[in-house]
């Protein structure tokens, strides 16, 4: 074990003085608050962007199965 002690100390040294940078987080409110209409549009765009492609794949699943077997 005495042979492994110096290499282990070399590997552990950088971990002891590891400094995590401080995040620059602002606690101020937004300059221009988003209206409920903007929030609704943003949410609907997010849902549509995820659901339309998956719906397309699910609706064409049978044709995908047929094309993969031939």
Swiss-Prot record:
The gene is COX8B. It comes from the Eukaryota. The chain crosses the membrane at residues 36-59. Keywords: Membrane, Mitochondrion, Mitochondrion inner membrane, Transit peptide, Transmembrane, Transmembrane helix. The keyword Transit peptide applies. Belongs to the cytochrome c oxidase VIII family. This is Cytochrome c oxidase subunit 8B, mitochondrial. Residues 25-35 are mitochondrial matrix.
